[in-house]
Amino acid sequence: MDKKWPAWIVLGLIALIAGCALGLTNEVTAPVIKEQALASADEARRAVLPAATDFEEMAVDNDDIDYCYKGLANGETIGYTAQITVKGYGGEIEVVVGVDNDGVITGINVGGANFSETAGLGAKTKEPAFTEQFKGLSAPLTLKGNVDSVSGASVSSGAIVNGVNTVLDYVAGLEK
């Protein structure tokens, strides 16, 4: 006697097996993804405050700032790095800013895991032609004043400038 299983049972078993496989894959890859994210954040901190040899995480009391680290060299504070997430034209943009003790920008890093700006336009905000112009500047920054916009990406360029100004204001208020 040939007995067929109802289609809903077969479909349910396939869904159960697929769900278990996805859950197992997530369980195995989650620690690796977290480790890579931490390494990427550390690399960004070191790029924007290159004189620092160590970083010490600080408590953040500002909802706009994602995190802030004190940059140290020979046990002395030489500056700060902070990350802010701003809303660009294509979505969220993570901006890591390095600032020395005098409030002067030592570098910025633009991007993030969810960076989805338009290729050839907003994506150019990640390029050195845009990010390098921030080095040596201090607050207040203005688009078309002391920072040039990326052509065709004024929304994203403006969001980044506003985010950097927010970080500069935050760092200026820290006890040094």
Language model regions located:
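Flexible, solvent-exposed loop/hinge segments and secondary-structure transition points
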Residues: 2-176
